A protein has these predicted regions:
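Alpha/beta-hydrolase fold catalytic core
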Residues: 1-35, 56-59, 97-98, 125, ...
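Conserved HGGG/HGGXW glycine-rich cap/lid loop of the alpha/beta-hydrolase fold
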Residues: 17-77
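Conserved acidic catalytic loop of the alpha/beta-hydrolase fold
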Residues: 83-100
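Gly/Ala-rich beta-loop-alpha elbow adjacent to hydrolase catalytic centers
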Residues: 104, 108, 112
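Flexible "cap/lid" loop of the alpha/beta hydrolase fold
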Residues: 113-159
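Conserved alpha/beta-hydrolase catalytic His-Asp/Glu region
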Residues: 138-148, 158-217
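Conserved loop-alpha-helix segment in the C-terminal half of the alpha/beta-hydrolase fold
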Residues: 218-258
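Catalytic active-site module of serine/aspartate enzymes centered on a nucleophile-bearing elbow/loop
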Residues: 249-283
Length: 283
């Protein structure tokens, strides 16, 4: 099908991208626009504990399911950072948004950075990176000695391809950290299992091989990195701290005792941090 401009579709809560992929979105509240970008294999449901309270505080909270995730369509293509950045532009354009605060969790750190590289900051006022997991560069190379060996990534890929449900079960407990009941884990697992197998594998692959270091250095909008010091999915010293070091003027706030899913376990603190980033009140 020929590419067309992105538009709001007749279906409720639906945006059609330039390549006619259907994206489900939710749009709560009025005021300062925040666009929430979900983690790997998660969807817009993950942001409930940010969107609901912030939408009552003069914030317009928007989140969408990435292609191949949740209620969005699975086109069988486009599971790369360029296309995901294009999808984000489709959302911002269709909703005619400007002055946006991007809130990017985990792999979405790469989406946010690539968006700024491809489209600039005309629509974006600032970016909050929540437990970034795609930046700066995960793979160990001669000029990235602190990265992870390619052989370990290949082991992980094989485990994902053999049985994604078993991989999730083996890695679920550290995600939120100690003191969390089984119910939130089951909630996250249900989201993950709504992701297409192809999208899951392709995004896991591109996340590990994409080098964002040069792109991070070119970011000009105010940037905040929030990261837990017990993040087993994306360790602080591998991702969050070097991401902050590469973005000019970025701020890094470390959440003590927090894992990768602190949007749930530390929701109130995160919400206060986002409000402070907007200039609303001290965190």
């Amino acid at each position: 099908m020929n590419a067309t401009a992105p538009y709001l579709a007749d279906e409720p809560n639906t945006i059609r991208t330039a390549d006619n992929t259907r994206l489900f979105y939710r749009d709560w509240g009025q005021g300062t626009p925040l666009v929430f970008l979900s983690g790997w294999t998660l969807n817009s449901d993950m942001w409930a504990y940010q969107m609901e309270p912030l939408s009552r505080l003069d914030c317009r909270c928007i989140a969408y399911d990435r292609r191949g995730h949740g209620r969005s369509s699975d086109p069988g293509r486009g599971y790369d950072f360029d296309t995901l950045a294009d999808d984000l532009e489709s959302v911002l354009s269709a909703l005619d948004l400007s002055g946006v605060t991007l809130v990017a969790h985990s792999i979405a750190s790469g989406e946010a950075v690539r968006y700024l590289t491809r489209y600039g900051s005309a629509r974006v006022a600032r970016v909050a990176f929540i437990a970034p997991a795609a930046t700066p560069y995960l793979l160990k190379t001669d000029d990235n000695p602190n990265g992870i060996d390619a052989a370990l990534f290949e082991q992980g890929r094989l485990a994902l391809s053999r049985s994604f449900p078993d991989w999730i079960e083996a890695n679920a407990a550290p995600y939120f950290g100690p003191g969390v009941s089984r119910a939130p884990l089951d909630w996250a697992i249900r989201m993950m299992l709504q992701t297409s197998h192809q999208a899951m594998l392709e995004l896991a692959r591109v996340q590990t091989i994409t080098d964002f270091r040069a792109e991070l250095a070119k970011i000009e909008v105010p940037s905040l990195i929030l990261h837990g010091d017990r993040d087993a999915s994306a360790p602080l010293e591998l991702t969050g701290r070097p991401t902050a070091a590469l973005i000019p003027g970025a701020s890094l706030h470390v959440y003590e005792g927090a894992g990768h899913g602190f949007y749930f376990t530390h929701a109130e603190r995160l919400n206060q941090g986002l409000l402070a980033f907007l200039g609303r009140q001290p965190a």
